[in-house]
């Protein structure tokens, strides 16, 4: 095994590195780092900048000397080239071309603390005792539980692991035994001893990564401030292997908060990781909501406010603390974000926390790539922020579309960068620009026979591959590999579902399965011998593997797309507005070019004139309505649903895709590009079930549509998949029950027709008043509470949900419940006139129960009619109008005319 780093810090002129040695042991070394920078020179040199100019290395005796030299160069107007982030330079110098790491040696700690107080504990003040800490260690695979038995709020008895294992009805907490077997429980009589022992644990088992849910915003600052208050600043600094713990106040739209860094340890808040890498929009990002969504298990339930739980049920309090930590572990097992951070960090050769910034990530990737070629990176420049054009989105008609095929360009912006060869050093000048519609129509003159061009007017070298295209290609192929793995697992899951539908067998021994490989026909035939239980467990394994692969491919997609964004970001070393504009304008022309070509082709096939077959389209895809094609061949030729879907599939593969490829090759030749990389493949096949009254698909507006998809990228579904975009079902503000009801309504619109929708509407209207209040409440984000707070009452132009927040504050005053802060998600219910709360609505923290002291009053005054009309009827009416149907049966006068 080779050495690999787990932490890099600068201390004066030295680098302090924590690393894993060849025997898997953690070591620390302090190195006097001698950086090398570069300047332009006239003499011939093996070192060149990205433009081919000669560069001379400048080796410095210390990092301070290097920084002083850079400042002097700036003062006289000369460029100081090379990597000025000496942590990145050190990693590159020390570890060379590729870092091979072993995840099992990287110590990851996952922590959650509990604090009991009269009011919600402020981490900046840390005025209440920490009375419980659960700290999970990945190398030990143990939960270290620190329990304060005697506090200012009274004494409690020890937590009992045997009782924790029992069922709730037996007075237990239903904590799984496999978790309890890994708990090391440590009770303490006073907080001072508990905190000292916790610091000792840190020093003995110091994490490389410290994570947990919202630890950056709460747990870390509370622990640091509390330790500083009780044990002193020297004790607080013991958390850092180099004795350096720093804090800073940051201002955001919600006010100020204190953020701590523990040098030598990477603090990665799992809430931040989830928000950045999950691409999942939820009504609440509380741990309970996310855990329920990801693992189908919530937090442990308890009665009353959390600040009373320790004294009323200390046993549940500690079990609750343990399960909170386990919930984060369970989410990571599914999502794999810690592994993602490690793989991206070691690929880029940068500290773990850098992956949160795509600009830092790409700076490191490009630096290391160029270094291997003796190329020197440019100095970070200073630029004025300017806007540039975005993508083109087609304006769809708000109507139903029965037969739809979508076609999608593979990684559009990265492909444009590679096709045109867009990079700072490949720019070769300008050509005379014609109006964009002339390039779309192909009537403008060919810009150049020598250089690769973009319709924004800039020309690029065709022969030497640019640094930006070269690096983006590497990550592109990584993403392609992960997407292939994801696709294999998804196809396997669908294949097993079809086996279950045909009837399972009797074998109950689970077979060995090779991950990320598509099952062979022989293996699928063999699977028909297994029981439904075994097959369902295999489906679950396939879906988990697909989720992990999806995380990896999605985040590589975001990384390669972020390079386009970085090119237009003034803080990026390779910022160039000409390049950012070249990408977007080429994209605008490219998508409208193919829309023109598709219309020309289908008008010819169908024998029509000027028919617009493009139902919709956006940055990198078009949705083609093939109703006329189906009309031409005749719907009666299809005996089964799969016959129709397969016809559309073959038409897409054998007719449309080749035509599209030829069209994009024409564009490549027209722009004289380096290579043809605009590859557009068939994505979705959407249609109603054969013989049904469903509409198949409909659009409401740009990027707002619903499709009944039978095949997605050659993955044939056992049951049609609803592809819903931009509708209220996707919005986190829509109540959970209404989301589900709207989704079912959409399914009926697409698959069954008007009568079915009307029947469902009548039934749901009756059920609505009986639903739990939490699933019908709207979800909003509470911002600018203080702005609209007029002595506890709503001020001028106060938003509806902020009125609810103020109502809640008045109602719970003195109850000791957690306050609603700016930025918190809240659930909102309208109230009927005459209610005891004195306003139109009430709002409380999302994902929680209303306090029992006010719950019954709120429930008896809910304005169900207003809420039903606003949250369900209004969006449903818009959908039905677009689909050409009514959600309610309308009275008719037809009977008068016989």
Swiss-Prot record:
Substrate binds at residues 411-413, 479, 557. Residues 702-705 are annotated as: Binding of DNA in B-conformation. Replicates the viral genomic DNA. This polymerase possesses two enzymatic activities: DNA synthesis (polymerase) and an exonucleolytic activity that degrades single-stranded DNA in the 3'- to 5'-direction for proofreading purpose. Residues 101-337 are annotated as: 3'-5'exonuclease. Belongs to the DNA polymerase type-B family. Residues 245-261 are annotated as: Beta hairpin. The gene is 43. The record marks 618, 703 as: Optimization of metal coordination by the polymerase active site. The N-terminus contains the 3'-5' exonuclease activity. The C-terminus contains the polymerase activity and is involved in binding to the polymerase clamp protein. A beta hairpin structure is necessary for the proofreading function of the polymerase. The record marks 711 as: Essential for viral replication. InterPro entries: DNA-dir_DNA_pol_B, DNA-dir_DNA_pol_B_CS, DNA-dir_DNA_pol_B_exonuc, DNA-dir_DNA_pol_B_multi_dom, DNA/RNA_pol_sf, DNA_pol_palm_dom_sf, DNA_pol_type-B, DPOL_T4. Mg(2+) 3 binds at residues 408, 620. Its cofactor is Mg(2+). Mg(2+) 1 binds at residues 112, 114, 324. This is DNA-directed DNA polymerase. Changing residue 219 to A: Almost complete loss of exonuclease activity. Decreased replication fidelity. The keyword DNA-binding applies. It holds the Pfam family DNA_pol_B. GO terms for molecular function: 3'-5' exonuclease activity; DNA binding; DNA-directed DNA polymerase activity; metal ion binding; nucleotide binding.
């Amino acid at each position: 095994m080779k050495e690999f780093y787990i932490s890099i810090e600068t201390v004066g002129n030295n680098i302090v590195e924590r690393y894993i040695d060849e025997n898997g042991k953690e070591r620390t070394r302090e190195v006097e780092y001698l950086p090398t920078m570069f300047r332009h020179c006239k003499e011939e040199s093996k070192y060149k900048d990205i433009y081919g100019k000669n560069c001379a290395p400048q080796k410095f005796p210390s990092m301070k000397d290097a920084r002083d030299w850079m400042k002097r160069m700036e003062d006289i107007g000369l460029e100081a080239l090379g990597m000025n982030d000496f942590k990145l330079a050190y990693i590159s110098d020390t570890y060379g071309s590729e870092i091979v790491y072993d995840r099992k040696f990287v110590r990851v700690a996952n922590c959650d603390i509990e604090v009991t107080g009269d009011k919600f504990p402020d981490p900046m003040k840390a005025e209440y005792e920490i009375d419980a800490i659960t700290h999970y260690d990945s190398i030990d695979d143990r939960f270290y539980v620190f329990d304060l038995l005697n506090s200012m709020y009274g004494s409690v008895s020890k937590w009992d692991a045997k009782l924790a294992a029992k069922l709730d009805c037996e007075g237990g907490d239903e904590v799984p035994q496999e978790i309890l077997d890994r708990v090391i429980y440590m009770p303490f009589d006073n907080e001072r001893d508990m905190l000292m022992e916790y610091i000792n644990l840190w020093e003995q088992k110091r994490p490389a990564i410290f994570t947990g849910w919202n630890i950056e915003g709460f747990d870390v600052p509370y622990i640091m401030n509390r330790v500083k208050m009780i044990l002193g600043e020297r004790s607080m600094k013991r958390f850092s292997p180099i004795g350096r713990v720093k804090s800073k106040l940051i201002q955001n739209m919600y006010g100020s908060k204190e953020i701590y860094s523990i040098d030598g340890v990477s603090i990665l808040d799992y809430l931040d990781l989830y928000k950045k890498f999950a691409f999942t929009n939820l009504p609440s990002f509380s741990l309970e909501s996310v855990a329920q969504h990801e693992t189908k298990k919530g937090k442990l339930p308890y009665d009353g406010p959390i600040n009373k739980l320790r004294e009323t049920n200390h046993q549940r309090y500690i079990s609750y603390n343990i399960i909170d930590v386990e919930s984060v572990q369970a989410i990571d097992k599914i999502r794999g974000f810690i592994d993602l951070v490690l793989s991206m960090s070691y690929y880029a050769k940068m500290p773990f926390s850098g992956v949160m910034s795509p600009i830092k990530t790409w700076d490191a990737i490009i630096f290391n790539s160029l270094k291997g070629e003796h190329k020197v990176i440019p100095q970070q420049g200073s630029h004025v922020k300017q806007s540039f054009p975005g993508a083109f989105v087609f304006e769809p008609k708000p109507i139903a579309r029965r037969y739809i095929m979508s076609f999608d360009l593979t990684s559009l912006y990265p492909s444009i960068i590679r096709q045109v060869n867009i990079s700072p050093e490949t720019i070769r000048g300008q050509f005379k620009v014609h109006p964009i519609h002339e390039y779309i129509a192909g009537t403008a003159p060919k810009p150049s026979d020598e250089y690769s061009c973009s319709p924004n007017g800039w020309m690029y070298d065709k022969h030497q591959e640019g640094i930006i295209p070269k690096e983006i290609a590497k990550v592109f192929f990584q993403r392609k590999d992960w997407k292939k793995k994801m696709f294999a697992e998804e196809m396997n899951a669908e294949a097993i579902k079809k086996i279950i539908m045909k009837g399972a067998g009797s074998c109950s021994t689970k077979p060995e399965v090779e991950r990320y490989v598509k099952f062979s026909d022989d293996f699928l035939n063999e699977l028909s011998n297994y029981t439904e239980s075994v097959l369902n467990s295999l489906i679950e394994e396939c879906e988990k593997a697909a989720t992990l692969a999806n995380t990896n491919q999605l985040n590589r997609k975001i990384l390669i797309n972020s390079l386009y964004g970085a090119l237009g970001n003034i803080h990026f070393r390779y910022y160039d507005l000409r390049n950012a504009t070249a990408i977007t304008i080429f994209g605008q022309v490219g998508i409208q070019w193919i829309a023109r070509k598709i219309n020309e082709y289908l008008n010819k096939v169908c024998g029509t004139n000027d028919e617009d077959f493009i139902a919709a389209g956006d940055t990198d895809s078009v949705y083609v309505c093939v109703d006329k094609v189906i009309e031409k061949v005749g719907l009666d030729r299809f005996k089964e649903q799969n016959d129709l879907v397969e016809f559309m599939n073959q038409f897409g593969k054998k007719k449309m895709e080749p035509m599209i490829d030829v069209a994009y090759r024409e564009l490549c030749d027209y722009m004289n590009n380096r290579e043809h990389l605009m590859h557009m493949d068939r994505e979705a096949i959407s249609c109603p079930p054969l013989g049904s009254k469903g509409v198949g698909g409909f659009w409401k507006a740009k990027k707002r549509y619903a499709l009944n998809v039978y095949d997605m990228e050659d993955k044939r579904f056992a049951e049609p998949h609803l592809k819903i975009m931009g509708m209220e079902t996707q919005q986190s503000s829509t109540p959970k029950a209404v989301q589900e009801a709207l989704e079912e309504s959409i399914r009926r619109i697409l698959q069954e027709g008007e009568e079915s929708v009307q029947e469902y509407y009548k039934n749901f209207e009756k059920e609505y008043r009986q639903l739990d209040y939490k699933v019908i409440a709207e979800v909003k984000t509470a911002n600018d509470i203080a702005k609209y707070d007029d002595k506890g009452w709503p001020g001028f132009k106060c938003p509806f949900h902020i009125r609810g927040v103020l109502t809640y504050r008045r109602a719970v005053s003195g109850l000791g419940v957690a306050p609603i802060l700016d930025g918190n998600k809240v659930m909102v219910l309208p109230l009927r006139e005459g209610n005891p709360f004195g306003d139109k609505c009430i709002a409380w923290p999302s994902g929680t129960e209303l306090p029992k002291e006010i719950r019954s009053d709120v429930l008896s005054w809910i304005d169900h009619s207003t809420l039903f009309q606003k949250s369900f009827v209004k969006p449903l009416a818009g959908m039905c109008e677009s689909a050409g149907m009514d959600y309610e049966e309308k009275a008719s006068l037809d009977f008068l005319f016989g």
